[in-house]
């Protein structure tokens, strides 16, 4: 510590040893200044002169201000107490570009440790300055678009001036693909237009025979393309109903629709979906079952219509149900093509509520109004006498009879015709009885209380006996139909529950068999089947 304190004291002082300039004589100082002055004056370089701004020459005399200065008066207008900035700005010299750049605020340098900064903002700013528009084209104005993006981002490069190797490769691949597609199309058309391979194909298209003309070639292409799309448009099977012996079934086929004919479905917020059964449906089906082969043909999908059919016809009075899968799709409509039924169309009657469903066979159709849920409707019951007459009288072709009722209400018109025929029949019967002499044996037997046998072995009345009693032929047919209907109703009342139980057991048995077959197929697939 003592050494550090003594060390500054031992150092020599500069102020004491340095000679004092003021002590030198004046003559020596003048000689020094005279000797150090250069003989030629020093001139500044031109670069330094140009960099320094020229200072305006100072006025030789100071400006004389007026004794009275209006801007400092307190009583004058405040607006007049302002300096004339415009005059000062005009009188002051313009600032140089270097000075404006120095006065501009300096932006911070980018931090390159965070990556190279984006130049998008600078490019957009330069583009906007070049185009003369300082705002973005938010409204997508076409004029602004052409003005701002007329160069397509290429700048001074012309449109076809540069093409990369990748673009050339893509262009070659595109040309190759187009060529292959064209060759494939031509080859495919030529293959589709070839002659028929088998006799079955040629018989299936009788209007398009084999040949090498352009028209036949085009027709075969069209026919084969139609075969491809027919899988989705035509019915699922070429024969919707199986082949049966005509002696074991009714000779006539009655095809019925479901929606708005037998049932009516509606939706409401309070009850949701509800399905109502039309009045007289049970009587209609059970009565006509003895004359017709009943077929349900609906455009509703099977998953929806099958549940309704189970409730509508629990005793399987309807023999064959057909759903949307059996219809034909054409021009946006589901058509019921009766030619797929595998039945003679002269003995087929279709009852529907839409004319579009019977577009292909309108001569076989009876179009009724849609049932809207009226509980007092009697349309189906009123149609029974006409249908019973067609089947009971054995009409050869139902289409001719239906054509005679075209444009008229069938129940009303048939009632008028039946009344006219009954009046004529009664008149002819009365005239015949007057001409026919009464036999003596008949009068004697009636007097003794004996009646002649005018019935068959099964208890049915002979037609001739019925005619003598004044009954028309279809009156006798109607009586037999009523008796058969009563027998059917009696069987349903006595054995209906038994039939339902048997059908439920049969369905359960089929379901169990299907489950067993599915389990066996799964275990066999994974190698767990039974070893023989």
UniProtKB/Swiss-Prot annotation:
Q: Does the keyword Lyase apply?
A: no
CDD domains, per this entry?
A: HAD_FCP1-like
GO CC entries:
TIM23 mitochondrial import inner membrane translocase complex
Here the segments flagged for biased composition (Low complexity) are 61-106
UniProt feature, compositional bias: Basic and acidic residues: 141-157
Q: Which cysteines are joined by disulfide bonds?
A: none
Q: Domain FCP1 homology, which positions?
A: 247-390
Membrane-crossing residues?
Answer: 176-193
Residue spans, topological domain Mitochondrial matrix: 33-175
State which ranges are Mitochondrial intermembrane (membrane side).
Answer: 194-532
InterPro entries cross-referenced by the UniProt entry: FCP1_dom (IPR004274), HAD-like_sf (IPR036412), HAD_sf (IPR023214), TIM50 (IPR050365)
An individual GO BP term: protein import into mitochondrial matrix
Q: Where does the UniProt annotation place the signal sequence?
A: none
- Which named protein is this? Mitochondrial import inner membrane translocase subunit tim50
């Amino acid at each position: 510590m003592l050494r550090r304190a003594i060390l500054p004291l031992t150092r020599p002082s500069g102020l004491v040893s340095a000679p004092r300039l003021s002590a030198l004589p004046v003559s020596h100082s003048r000689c020094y200044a005279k000797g150090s002055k250069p003989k030629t004056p020093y001139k500044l370089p031109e670069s330094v002169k140009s960099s320094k701004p020229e200072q305006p020459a100072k006025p030789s005399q100071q400006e004389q201000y007026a004794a009275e200065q209006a801007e400092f008066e307190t009583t004058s207008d405040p607006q007049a107490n302002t300096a004339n900035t415009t005059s000062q700005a005009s009188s002051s010299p313009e600032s140089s570009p270097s000075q404006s750049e120095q006065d501009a605020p300096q932006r911070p340098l980018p931090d390159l440790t965070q990556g190279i900064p984006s130049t998008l903002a600078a490019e957009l700013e330069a583009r906007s300055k070049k185009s003369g528009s300082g705002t973005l084209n938010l409204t997508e104005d076409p004029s602004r678009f052409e003005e701002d993006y007329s160069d397509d981002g290429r700048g001074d490069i012309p449109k076809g001036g540069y093409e990369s190797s990748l673009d050339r490769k893509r262009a070659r691949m595109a040309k190759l693909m187009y060529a292959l597609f064209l060759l494939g199309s031509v080859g495919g058309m030529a293959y589709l237009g070839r002659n028929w391979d088998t006799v079955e194909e040629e018989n299936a298209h009788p209007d398009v025979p084999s040949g090498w003309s352009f028209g036949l070639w085009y027709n075969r292409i069209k026919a084969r393309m139609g075969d491809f799309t027919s899988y989705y448009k035509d019915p699922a099977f070429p024969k919707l109903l199986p082949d049966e012996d005509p002696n074991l079934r009714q000779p006539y086929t009655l095809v019925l629709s479901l929606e708005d004919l037998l049932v009516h479905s509606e939706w409401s917020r309070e009850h949701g979906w509800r399905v109502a059964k039309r009045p007289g449906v049970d009587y209609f089906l059970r009565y006509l079952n003895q004359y017709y082969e009943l077929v349900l043909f609906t455009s509703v999908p099977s998953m929806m219509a099958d549940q309704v059919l189970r409730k509508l016809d629990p005793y399987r009075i309807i023999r064959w149900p057909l759903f949307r899968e059996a219809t034909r799709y054409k021009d946006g409509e589901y058509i019921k093509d009766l030619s797929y039924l595998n039945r003679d169309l002269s003995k087929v009657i279709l009852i529907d509520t839409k004319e579009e469903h019977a577009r292909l066979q309108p001569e076989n159709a009876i179009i009724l109004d849609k049932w809207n849920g009226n509980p007092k409707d009697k349309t189906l019951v009123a149609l029974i006498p006409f249908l019973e007459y067609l089947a009971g009288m054995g009409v050869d072709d139902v289409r001719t009879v239906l054509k005679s009722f075209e444009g008229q209400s069938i129940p009303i018109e048939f009632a008028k015709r039946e009344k006219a025929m009954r009046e004529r029949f009664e008149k002819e019967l009365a005239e015949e009885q007057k001409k026919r002499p009464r036999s003596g044996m008949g009068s004697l037997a009636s007097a003794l209380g004996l009646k002649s046998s005018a019935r068959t072995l099964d208890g049915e009345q002979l037609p001739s006996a019925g005619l003598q009693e004044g009954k028309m032929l279809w009156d006798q047919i109607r009586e037999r139909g009523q008796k058969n209907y009563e027998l059917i109703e009696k069987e349903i009342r006595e054995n209906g529950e038994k039939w339902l139980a048997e059908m439920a057991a049969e369905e359960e048995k089929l379901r169990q068999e299907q489950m067993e077959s599915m389990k066996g197929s799964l275990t066999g697939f994974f190698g767990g089947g039974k070893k023989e």
